[in-house]
Amino acid sequence: RGLGDVYKRQEQCITEDRYDFVNDIIIRNKSSKKIYVYALESYWNNISSVEGYFKTNMDFLKPEVRDFFFKQYPDVYSKAEDLPPAKYNPGSKVSNSLISSGCIVNGTVENSVVFKQAYIGNNSVIRNAVILNDVYIGDNTVVENCIVESHSTINPGEHFGDENELKVINERNFRYSL
């Protein structure tokens, strides 16, 4: 009973390819279980889909969301690694983006979140994207409105995405559109 029931329900949902904790576990059990809540008056986003994951990352580009986590609660720690700071080479342009340690930026990054150890090639444009760990993006490449999964390589001259559709790119390149 209690948390054991929650874990069982969570495992059942995963086998059914359902990952929405709020709808699949909390709301589904509201009439049969005692559920206690805490009124949260700050930022919250239910990450139950790829779109939700993308939106949550993009929300961190808003000063009020970023400030809530990093100014109001400055003791948020992530995994400690001994990485150099991000490097912005001559000709690079970055606006309204979060660039993590170990990244090398040679191109343009706009409205994007770039996780650690990513490489952005010369004359490449990254726009409205989430670039995960250890991604290599070659020269003269455009990545727009995409999530690029960890350890992916985007070859020079490739163009992924457009402003109307969210795409997920993996190690073997294009995975699916949403």
What are these regions (language model features)?
Residues 12-178:
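Left-handed beta-helix
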Residues 2-7:
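Short, small-residue-biased leader/transition segments that mark boundaries at the very start
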